[in-house]
Amino acid sequence: MQKDPQVASEVKEILNIIKEIAPGGLVELRIPPYAAIQCVAGGNHKRGTPPNTVEMSGQVLIQLIKEPRSWHKLCAQGDIAASGINSDLSQIFVIAATKYPAQ
């Protein structure tokens, strides 16, 4: 999978905002092929597949930061794969959207 430099830059910026507002290791947020971070306080994951994972494309991440209330719709459409009891990041994206400068 080829990386788009513009998408890579925006993904990095968005993930830095997420880490700032929701530090921790309870959820692994994966944006292949760009990056993966651990976020949300309340636990730490060290090895293997974490119990709470969220995965989406870079384009979906960018769409979500611009339309943060679309979390549940994007999950239902299969654009976001979220598994685990603590994998609902919808409110984190609502907060993150207020800090994203490209609005």
Regions found by a protein language model. Give the residues of each.
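Feature captures hydrophobic
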Residues: 1-103
